[in-house]
Amino acid sequence: MDPNERPSSVSSGRPGSKVYPKTPIGEKFDNIATGRDVEWEPLVDFRRMDVSENTIHGAIAWAHGGEIIHSFGGNVLIYGRSMMKPFMMKVFAEVLDKELNWDQKSIACSSHNGDTEHVAAAQSILNESEWGLMQCPLDVPLVQFGRQVRRPRRWFHTCSGEHAAVLKGMRLLGIRRAGYTLPNSDWFPLYIDVLREYMGDPDWSPDRVAKDGCGMPTTSNTVNELAIMFANLGSRRDEDWIWEAMNRNPDLVGGFNRLDSTCLKAGEGKILAKEGADGLLGLSVIHKDWPRGLGIVIKIAHGWNSQATWYISRAVLGVLGIHLRNPYPLHRQKAFIVPGIVPEMYSEALESIVTWDEWDPDRDRFSLDWKKYTEATTRSDPFSNEGDGGP
């Protein structure tokens, strides 16, 4: 029998088929716009000698307190993923305050590279007898130098610090820890309350609650909702230890050459930055022109692209007077920012935030004019040197 004609054991209507999609084209659900339906906008394009080779689409939202002051790319419905760890930790912030040191508090909010210092900080949160409770996936370090670790461990996973802190917090709150990654665990309604509080919407309910890559629940939110939450994160930064912990130890939040760690260093205490999987970055900025807190959320349409997100972040922070260095240069390309990523009041300032450095010349072009040389050497008749064609 042709394999393509063989009935699948999980075809629609068969036992077990409910856990699979009904169609590879994708189903339509009320009030759930897919990435095909939304109005993504170009945010940055990479050009080789004036010609665009890659154009990175996405969405960006700016919020001042509870007000959206700028939106570009549509109010897309997405998942907050690991970008929401500062909010998740607010569920446990009070009970963990006196229990954790600053390194442990920082790693609790992290999506770390899995370096030695990351693993040590995460492991120190729990007693060794509790390590077996950890349910984050087995993984190898996200970034490795020198000796390569090839045997996966839960502690190497980028979310191990969060999982350890949640387990610690649940014990202190007297919550049963079995099944802690499930949305029916008693801590999850407390997390929903945190999101409602920071959105300023007591009636909010997520359209979807999905399983994140690390196994934890992640809620669907619009880009605008996320920006409002990040704005309020800044205005309420003194209510707990989260802002200070992430700024005290930025390299524990991400690690070497990670965007959120580098943003935290650039902000010198005026920024909280957190990356999320599949092209997310949340920024909470303390700025004199925005007294109710400024929240900026970037979402890359096609998913993870640290370099593109970095150029966008440099631009939006640059117009606010915060210097974020350029990422490491592209290979014989240049990045160019789309003006729509910033409110119109910052358009002029955007012109001065260059996407290259003095040691990063135009290596995407030759220093000679090819026309000058080809006109002198090319024959007008390409067959003139092939003889007279014979008798």
PLM regions and their residue ranges:
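Active-site-adjacent helix/loop patches that line small-molecule binding or acyl-intermediate pockets
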Residues: 2, 10-40, 102-216, 221, ...
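Beta-lactamase-like hydrolase cores
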Residues: 2-7, 13-77
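Short Gly/Pro-enriched turn/cap motifs at secondary-structure boundaries
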Residues: 49-52, 156, 270-274
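Short acidic-glycine loop/turn motifs at beta-strand connectors
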Residues: 63-67, 95, 222, 285-291
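Glycine-/proline-rich flexible loop or hinge segments
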Residues: 68-75, 100-110
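Active-site SXXK
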Residues: 80-97
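Structured C-terminal helix/loop/strand segments within mature extracytoplasmic catalytic/sensor domains
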Residues: 233-391
